[in-house]
């Protein structure tokens, strides 16, 4: 696979900080999009030139999630921070025709997490209200998906600048939040 675009998500930060253990010199990144340059002799699903993107949990195909199926590329095997990568045919899926490589590379983790929360689990309907917290990838995808479904989206952030960005993406009423941690009592 020739990697044309990759994206960073919270999982990649956790790996970089050592909070998800990996082998030394592991190539990071779990989300990418690219073009197939070669296929193995037993590959039947893909052909040279196909435009594909990574899958968040390539080992979880169906059914309830099980711990041993929830491993990521980028922690238990080398990831997409490379120009070329050899991966199993089950670890990728077709890029929708309306997306370019950069757009598709952002979908696998954050985009599908938002979709699962709002659509698969939440059964979101037009006219409902959704709260998104902060400006991370999942929140931004959730905001845009919810607006597409006709929902009102209330967004929160601790930054006025970030709230302006959320408004530009379609957030309705927004709320500025500032966390004040309690101090130790002197009594």
Where are these regions (language model features)?
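Glycine-rich beta-strand-centered segment in the early N-terminal region that forms part
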Residues: 1-6, 16-61, 76-79, 96-98
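Alpha-helix/helix-capping structural signal
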Residues: 6-8, 41, 90, 112
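Cytochrome P450 core scaffold surrounding the K-helix E-X-X-R motif
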Residues: 11-13
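NAD(P)H dinucleotide-binding glycine-rich loop of Rossmann-like/cofactor-binding domains
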Residues: 56-133
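Mid-domain Rossmann-like dinucleotide-binding core that forms the NAD(H)/NADP(H) cofactor-binding site
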Residues: 102-176
């Amino acid at each position: 696979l020739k990697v044309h675009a990759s994206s960073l998500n919270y999982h990649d930060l956790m790996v970089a900080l050592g909070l998800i253990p990996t082998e030394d010199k592991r190539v990071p990144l779990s989300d990418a999009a690219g073009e197939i340059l070669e296929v193995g002799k037993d590959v039947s699903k893909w052909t040279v030139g196909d435009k594909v993107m990574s899958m968040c949990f390539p080992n979880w195909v169906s059914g309830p999630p099980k711990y041993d199926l929830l491993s990521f590329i980028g922690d238990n095997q080398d990831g997409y921070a490379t120009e070329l990568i050899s991966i199993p045919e089950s670890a990728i899926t077709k890029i929708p025709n309306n997306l370019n490589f950069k757009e598709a590379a952002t979908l696998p983790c954050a985009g599908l997490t938002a979709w699962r929360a709002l659509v698969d689990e939440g059964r979101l309907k037009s006219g409902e209200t959704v709260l998104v917290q902060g400006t991370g990838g999942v929140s931004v995808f959730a905001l845009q998906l919810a607006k597409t479904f006709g929902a009102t989206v209330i967004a929160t952030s601790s930054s006025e600048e970030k709230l302006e960005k959320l408004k530009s993406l379609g957030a309705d009423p927004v709320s500025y939040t500032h966390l004040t941690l309690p101090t130790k009592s002197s009594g």
